[in-house]
Design a protein with these regions (language model features):
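Basic, nucleic-acid-binding surfaces and adjacent catalytic neighborhoods in DNA/RNA-processing proteins
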Residues: 22-42, 55, 167-297
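Phosphate/anion-contacting hairpin/loop surfaces
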Residues: 87-191, 196-203, 211
């Protein structure tokens, strides 16, 4: 599953490609993708909207849709009759395991697993592909976005003021879960998945199986800094992420930091710091990697 850095790279690529474009029409080939909305309602709400922006909240992609001074197309209810008002919606997308966007020309062949197609006013298509069909799309009024399911309970953004050292200390002190399990909880620490949690714990020199509440203040400080450092480096332009929206064969995420991995998927290899062999254990249904010497405590 793409983690925060990979989603950020996708957001940047989408922003360059589609901001300012108008959605002429849309087509849904996988009805469950947009539940509980029906296909006709979903398509009607998107028709003639302009893509005003693309941003991220945690691992969610937020595509902001504007309708200028007109209401979204459709039958007007009684309160909506009269002067036109400004309306805006947000298309909330979670890629889950295999979701990806492609930005195609009219001549490009239809890609496999293309479950949502957005026809734009420049004769291009924005196609959402998802081989495993776990991805999710939903339309939310911008004024209600902060209260939307999946968004409302997210932890603070890691680069915002709210994700402070004090916040992390308080969060860890209240939990009897292991550090690795807690770091994967998006309602406690945002944006980390299996890869970056393992890398942050290694940089901090902390055992992933340690109970969160037992971590010393000094180690919490090291972990806080390690989380920020790992995410910043993976998001930076020098990372190895490749997001080519125009070529499905060149589309690659989940590798934004691969050449810098120090423990993840390195079981049995020598630790880059001490030479000990990296270990792996199944924990919480996922593989956890760590150095038994550098991360003893």
């Amino acid at each position: 599953m793409p983690e925060l850095p990979e989603v950020e790279h996708v957001v940047r690529a989408l922003r360059r490609a589609i901001v300012g474009r108008r959605i002429v029409a849309s087509q849904i080939n996988l009805p469950k993708l947009i539940l509980p909305l029906s296909q006709p309602v979903f398509n009607r709400k998107l028709k003639d909207s302009t893509i005003a922006g693309v941003r991220r909240r945690g691992k969610y992609i937020l595509i902001e849709l504007e309708y200028g001074d007109a209401l979204p197309p459709g039958p007007a209810t009684a309160p909506e009759r009269g002067p036109a008002v400004h309306r805006s919606l947000v298309l909330v997308v979670h890629l889950r395991m295999t979701g990806k966007f492609l930005y195609l020309t009219a001549d490009d062949a239809a890609p496999k697993h293309g479950h949502a197609i957005f026809y734009l006013d420049n004769d291009r298509r924005l196609v959402f592909c998802d081989q495993r069909q776990f991805g999710v799309m939903k339309l939310v009024a911008r004024t209600r976005l902060s209260k939307a399911k999946g968004i409302s309970d997210l932890a603070p953004e890691p680069f915002g003021e709210d994700f402070s050292l004090a916040y992390l200390k308080e969060t860890l002190s209240r939990s009897r879960r292991t550090l690795k399990t807690l770091l994967l909880d998006q309602t406690r620490v945002l944006g980390l998945g299996n890869i970056y949690a393992a890398e942050a714990l290694f940089r901090a020199g902390v055992n992933p199986l340690k109970v969160a509440a037992t971590l010393s203040s000094k180690r919490v400080e090291r972990l806080h800094q390690a989380i920020l450092d790992v995410l910043r480096e993976a998001i930076s332009d020098s990372s190895t992420s490749r997001v080519n929206l125009e070529n499905s064969n060149g589309f690659s995420y989940g590798e934004a930091f691969e050449r810098f991995w120090q423990v993840y998927e390195r079981e049995g290899e020598a630790c880059v710091k001490c030479g000990a062999r990296i270990k792996r254990v199944s924990h919480g249904g996922r593989s956890t990697y760590w150095c038994p010497k550098c991360q003893r405590r």
